[in-house]
Amino acid sequence: MPPPIGYCPAVGFGGRHERSDAELLAAHVAGDRYAFDQLFRRHHRQLHRLARLTSRTSEDADDALQDAMLSAHRGAGSFRYDAAVSSWLHRIVVNACLDRLRRAKAHPTAPLEDVYPVADRTAQVETAIAVQRALMRLPVEQRAAVVAVDMQGYSIADTARMLGVAEGTVKSRCARARARLARLLGYLNTGVNIRR
């Protein structure tokens, strides 16, 4: 059934402002079938990047993101509005990635091919691959913390809420992850300071 005449998924009936994340989530819960799609599209790029950084392969990232969005779609009614909707979505994505990593660890498989792409000739691509490999060598909990804080820009407090741990735990996980990354990537010697 097409939407009613005069209805725009982005603004509802004749409104001139873009709906906030909280308004979109509330509209979804109230039955607006376009609201969740708009919310997902708004955050897709950042959520996919987070999933890719937290997963072993791009396929795992895609699957985890799909799992996360299905969970968010189904569980939207339980959102308490005590945090930003984007933080809630990020927490769901991180949890979906961690769940997949735990399942893979419990049921290891031998890869049929190298999971990392062949580096092309640019130093930027080589560095990105080296960083990705180093991230994959971190324990899952450390990786999730350092990706959220150092790569996604979340505060310690927001990361603690997303991961469901104490702020001190996030700080120690980040410190351990940074120290290990410095050892693993020290050969790059790019002169870039690791954020502390």
From Swiss-Prot:
Induction: Constitutively low in all growth stages; repressed by detergent (3.5-fold). Induced by WhiB5.
InterPro entries associated with the record: RNA_pol_sigma-70-like, RNA_pol_sigma-70_dom, RNA_pol_sigma70_r2, RNA_pol_sigma70_r4_t2, RNA_pol_sigma_r2, RNA_pol_sigma_r3/r4-like, WH-like_DNA-bd_sf
UniProt keyword terms in alphabetical order: DNA-binding, Sigma factor, Transcription, Transcription regulation
Disruption phenotype: No effect on growth in culture, or in isolated macrophages; infected guinea pigs have a partially attenuated lung infection.
UniProt free text on domains: The sigma-70 factor domain-2 mediates sequence-specific interaction with the -10 element in promoter DNA, and plays an important role in melting the double-stranded DNA and the formation of the transcription bubble. The sigma-70 factor domain-2 mediates interaction with the RNA polymerase subunits RpoB and RpoC.
NCBIfam families: PRK09643.1, sigma70-ECF
Protein name (database record): ECF RNA polymerase sigma factor SigM
Organism whose genome encodes this protein: Mycobacterium tuberculosis (strain ATCC 25618 / H37Rv)
Organism placement in taxonomy: Bacteria, Bacillati, Actinomycetota, Actinomycetes, Mycobacteriales
